[in-house]
Amino acid sequence: MKLFPVAIAIFYRWLPTQKLEVWVQKRVDDGPFHGLLEFPGGGVEAHEVPLQAVVREVDEEVGILVDPGLATQMGIYPNEMPNRTVLLYVFLFPEHSELNTKGQWLEIEQTQLSAPYKGQIPGPNHLIIDDLFRHLYDNQHE
């Protein structure tokens, strides 16, 4: 099966109320995730490494330049599709002041995690959001 690398950016903020907020935007292309709320990102081109791709994609999709030095790679999440395996390279970025008008913040609580957004976000993003919440929550309680 063909491997298709994709780099995504998660802008997040951890609130004093022990809640996580992640920034998403509505997908407008005609692909399988049309109309869903998704993280900025896209395919890694042949001449790029995933970090370069995520910086380029954020610029293309959101119109802001992010400092690659602020990125933290969270992990790689495989997603099986009918004709390929998508490898999601997930990069975390701190909140950026220019995001507020170009998308929306989703609030994630410990009791439900990403479950309230079922049908509103792509399936693979549930695992990513839930893992991110657990990681940040555990770091706050060490």
Positions of predicted regions on the chain:
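Conserved N-terminal beta-strand and adjoining loop/helix that marks the start
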Residues: M1-V22, L92
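Non-catalytic surface loops within mature trypsin-like serine protease
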Residues: R13, P68, F93-S97, Q110, ...
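A short coil-to-beta-strand element that immediately follows conserved catalytic motifs
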Residues: L65-G75
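Active-site-adjacent beta-strand/loop module that shapes the phosphate/pyrophosphate-binding cleft
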Residues: F4, G75-Q104, I108-E109, L132-R134
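Nudix hydrolase/Nudix homology domain
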Residues: H34, N100-E142
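Conserved Nudix-box catalytic region and its N-terminal flanking loop in Nudix hydrolases
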Residues: K19-E60
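Generic structural "secondary-structure junction" signal
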Residues: F39-G41, A46, N79, T101, ...
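Short, solvent-exposed loop/turn segments that connect beta-strands within catalytic domains
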Residues: W14-E21, P32-F33, P82-R84, L99
